[in-house]
Amino acid sequence: MAVPRERPYVQFNFLVDLGDGKGTDGTQAGFQECSNIGMEVTVAEYRNGNEVENSVRKITGLNKSTDVTLKRGVIGSLNLYSWLNDIRSGKQDAYRTVTIHLQNEDHTAVVQTWKLLRARIIKHVSGPMNAKGTDVAMEELTLSYERLEME
């Protein structure tokens, strides 16, 4: 699904599908920021005492996914709270596949997709609030997931 080209794509046209199936076009929430999409493969270092070379072997270890942060203005919806409440209540079906689509400049095509498999909210923060402030009231959501797929 990725659409390669010579010139890099801009970062500001993206859609987030929270995986609850309630959106008419697949997107349940607009976010201002989405950061830290990533994965790593850990490495275990190992060496026998009788090795000929004075170096360690690097053995492929476990896969790890980074926690993703989503930020948006407060819109008065309790959908994210309901999802978090399901998770903290121990509901086993509360895990979702969250999909992030990067779009081209004129919003006519998805050029890259990241799928966060078995995702769950692990942190929700609202604020800050300031009586003299003029900024938008914000909320921040942190997602943990078990596997990342890219298309």
Describe the function of each predicted region:
Residues 1-151:
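Glycine-rich, low-complexity intrinsically disordered segments
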